[in-house]
From Swiss-Prot:
PROSITE patterns: CYTB_CTER, CYTB_NTER. Keywords: Electron transport, Heme, Iron, Membrane, Metal-binding, Mitochondrion, Mitochondrion inner membrane, Respiratory chain, Transmembrane, Transmembrane helix, Transport, Ubiquinone. GO terms for biological process: mitochondrial electron transport, ubiquinol to cytochrome c. This is Cytochrome b. Its main location: mitochondrion.
Length: 379
């Protein structure tokens, strides 16, 4: 009897066990689609990025005009550039939905998968930040200046650290060159860590909406979830192309159409929409070091989620108290995102401070307490 090459060949066997014969819970909903969508985003961003790198010049005298050259003179350069810029926005939409799913359904109890995922988020944020500097527009330059300057809040070594990252006494040619190097390198690091993320996931298998063990009811990944993922991919690409072809600059900043000028500060310095919530938390604390710590903690708090889980049940599906807190957290993050894009004046300052306090209160205090109360209600 001839054996199936798919199951015996050393390389094909890995692919088979990961994407074809993988036993999957039969009841995972569309919320489980975002992992594969993130993989698709990563591939798309890498391909468009490599094509952009072929025509881009990482030099302060050429960067801005090389991006203009790409959009005007390169065959389909406008499409590649706009897909790359809007692909980043879609990437973060998928990341946030993926994390939200993990929080809601208690996926963070797979600690290794969760920790590699949170590290992937940090790497992706770093990649997006250095990438935003590359077109060398006003917001690129001042964004780089403001965010790298935050490191000067580090006691004793702060200023040295900032100058070391800048490669001089201000954001200059050395900074742009190294940011381009990092922007090219980091996605490959992300790919490697994505494989580790999947490796850890396949050690335990996927979680499911009930949070119960699903070993008794598994179905093969292909054809069921491969086609389901394909549908998700088609919908995501439709959204990306709609955004790219009809309103490519909707999510961008008009200031970035002005070449970088160290002598003129834009009226409102703000990052891309996907960083606004963290930027709002940073700005809500009057002390520089305090702001930086709050900014870092707002992301690093994700590492604490497995420790903060107090409930006997895994998912939020059957826990009304935690559900109210979860959706309050989402609403609060939307408020923070809105505040991050507003000028630093009242009432925005006060709203930002209240939303920042609420953000940490829900995650660190209220959710663990709600879990304990629900446990009491069960007994």
């Amino acid at each position: 009897m001839s054996t199936n090459l798919r199951k015996t060949h050393p390389l094909a066997k890995i692919i088979n066990n990961s994407f074809i014969d993988l036993p999957s819970p039969s009841n995972i909903s569309a919320w489980w689609n975002f992992g594969s969508l993130l993989g698709a985003c990563l591939i798309l961003q890498t391909i468009t990025g490599i094509f952009l790198a072929m025509h881009y010049s990482p030099d302060i005298s050429l960067a801005f005009s090389s991006v203009a050259h790409i959009t005007r003179d390169v065959q389909y350069g406008w499409l590649i550039r706009n897909m790359h810029a809007n692909g980043a926005s879609l990437f973060f939409m998928c990341i946030y939905l993926h994390i939200g799913r993990g929080l809601y359904y208690g996926s963070y109890l797979y600690k290794e998968t969760w920790n590699t995922g949170t590290t992937l988020l940090l790497l992706t944020m770093a990649t997006a930040f250095v990438g935003y500097v590359l077109p060398w527009g006003q917001m690129s330059f001042w964004g780089a200046t403001v965010i790298t300057n935050l490191l000067s809040a580090v006691p004793y070594i702060g200023n040295t650290l900032v100058q070391w990252i800048w490669g001089g006494f201000s954001v200059d040619n050395a900074t742009l060159t190294r940011f381009f190097a990092f922007h090219f390198l980091l996605p490959f690091t992300i790919m490697g860590l994505t494989m580790v993320h999947l490796l850890f996931l396949h050690e335990t298998g996927s979680n499911n909406p009930t949070g119960l063990n699903s070993n008794a009811d598994k179905i093969p990944f292909h054809p069921y979830f491969s086609y389901k993922d394909l549908l998700g991919l088609i919908l995501m690409l439709a959204l990306l192309l709609t955004l790219t072809l009809f309103s490519p600059n909707l999510l961008g900043d008009p200031d970035n159409f002005t070449p970088a000028n160290p002598l003129s500060t834009p009226p409102h310095i703000k990052p891309e929409w996907y960083f606004l919530f963290a930027y709002a938390i940073l700005r809500s604390i009057p002390n520089k070091l305090g702001g930086v710590l709050a900014l870092m903690l707002s992301i690093l708090v994700l590492f604490l989620m497995p420790i903060l889980h107090t409930s006997k049940q895994r998912t939020t599906q059957f826990r009304p108290l935690t559900q109210i807190l979860f959706w309050s957290l989402i609403a609060n993050l939307l408020v923070l995102t809105w505040i991050g894009g507003q000028p630093v004046e009242n009432p925005f300052i006060t709203i930002g401070q209240m939303a920042s306090i609420l953000h940490f209160s829900i995650l660190l205090i209220l959710m663990p307490i709600a879990g304990m109360i629900e446990n009491k209600m069960l007994t």
